[in-house]
Amino acid sequence: MKKFILFNSPIFWDTTKEKEQYLSPLGLGYIATYLEKAGIDVTIVDCVKERKSVTDIANFINKMHPDYIGINIFTQNYEMVKFIIESIEIACDCFIGGQAVKSIYFDILQWDTQNRLNIIIGEGEFIIPALVLGLCNQIPEEQKNQKFVYRVNKDSEYFPEDISNVFLDRRYLGNEIVDNHYGEKEIAIITSRGCAFDCAFCGGARSLNKDVTTRIRTEESVIMEIKEILSTYPDIQSIRILDDLFLRNGKSIDMANNIFSKFPQLSWRGMVHVLSLIGNIEKVKDLHNGRCRELFIGIESGSERMRKKINKLGSSDDVITVSKEILENGIDLKGYFIY
């Protein structure tokens, strides 16, 4: 059986004991799930959680001799991932993906490697198994020597259109439970893909992703996933929703409360945009009653001039109004700022 190793790429060059905030690599988990469905032996090495150095990873690949490796890349660890790929001494097909790829793939095409390098722009859980099995019908949009660029957009047959039916086998994430700052055992989920907003600083901005549709999971699929989590980890106390669109309007707030009404043993935390609450301010109390413990808001700046420059919708007054309502209703608030 062919061996595929997926790497959650490191954020430091060397082994470190720094206690950075940790989130499970859910995207790699989805890819691993569908590689297994295709009959491919797959494992995930979480270089962040295991605190592996860049040299450790390259040596590990050369020692293990996998047939395929896949690794995600971010703007801040570009040079680290480049070093890993260029340090592979064995023959193996490589896959590289992540939100940043669409902006840097021309640079990746210049990397010095003799191995086949599949550069995936977009979501990879369907196209990667097809490439491994030699069954991919999609023609690469760019090619240089042994490097191939595949774009998975809404026109691709490998685009996950209905994400309510995309399954995640959480076994591949290992011990994904984290202790949040309330001392609760917590697991993270994603309930949407794509974004309806167009912030100038974000790689997921709508204007940069016109070829990708925003997709929302059904209430039933989210309930089913939480049931599966509790079946596997009955001592879980909190769910963290990582995407921005779980609380996107009044109707979705009602849906959130209905979902967690099924799980009275759980609290939950999630992201929310100021615009989602400013028009539904009366529903903030409902969120507290639905055991929402903490909300995360991208404030970015209190300067109206700067907010306009970065296309951050909602005014500073909106931020103040929403923040005050959240706190007065007993929900904790975490604000993100850009410096």
What do the PLM-derived regions correspond to, one by one?
Residues 6, 71, 96, 241-243, ...:
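Conserved beta-strand positions
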Residues 8, 45-48, 72, 206, ...:
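Residue-level recognition of beta-strand->loop/alpha-helix junctions
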Residues 7, 97, 122, 336-338:
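Generic beta-sheet signal
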Residues 23, 164-334, 339:
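Radical SAM [4Fe-4S] cluster-binding motif and immediate context
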Residues 14-28:
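Glycine- and acidic-residue-enriched helix-capping/strand-helix junction motifs
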Residues 1-5:
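Extreme N-terminal starter segment of soluble prokaryotic enzymes
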Residues 31-159, 165:
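Glycine-rich beta-alpha loop elements in corrinoid/cobalamin-binding modules
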Residues 10-12, 16, 136-191:
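N-terminal [4Fe-4S]-dependent radical SAM core
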